[in-house]
């Protein structure tokens, strides 16, 4: 199974990736993260790197055609999480939390499993 994990370098994503990468049935994990959380240590601590493809990009601008048809399951964790700061940057929050979710939903086909953490 090939996974796409957006926001994979956040707290939940990094823990999840290390658990999933140890499973035999997981062949590849594609991660898209822009390091907005500045959790660089999460990247350094990744295990089973041979299964991981990492894109250090903002999902807003990422061309999902690069990975289309290579994904069996999407775990969508990317979002703007600082509620206090979100009021002063509504357009960015709309892009991150709504438009990116729409992009992810459009990427999947009828057989793609999508897990969305909100």
Predicted segment positions?
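N-terminal Rossmann/SDR dinucleotide-binding element
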Residues: 1-73
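Ser/Thr-centric signal marking residues that sit
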Residues: 6, 81, 101, 112
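Conserved Rossmann-fold NAD(P)-dependent oxidoreductase catalytic core, especially the SDR/UDP-sugar
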Residues: 76, 102-118
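Conserved active-site helix of classical SDR/Rossmann-fold NAD(P)-dependent CH-OH oxidoreductases
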Residues: 18, 101-102
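NAD(P)H-binding glycine-rich loop region in Rossmannoid oxidoreductase-like domains
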Residues: 59-95
């Amino acid at each position: 199974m090939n996974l796409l994990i957006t926001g994979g370098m956040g707290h939940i994503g990094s823990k999840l990736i290390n658990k999933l990468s140890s499973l035999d049935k997981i062949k590849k994990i594609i991660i898209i993260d822009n390091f907005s959380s500045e959790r660089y240590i999460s990247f350094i601590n990744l295990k089973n790197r041979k299964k991981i493809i990492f894109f250090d990009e903002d999902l807003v601008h990422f061309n999902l055609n690069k990975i289309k048809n290579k994904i069996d399951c999407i775990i969508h964790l990317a979002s703007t999480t600082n509620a206090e700061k979100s009021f002063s940057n509504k357009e960015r929050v709309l892009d991150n939390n709504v438009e990116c979710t729409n992009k992810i939903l459009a990427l999947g086909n009828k057989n793609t499993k999508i897990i969305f953490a909100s």
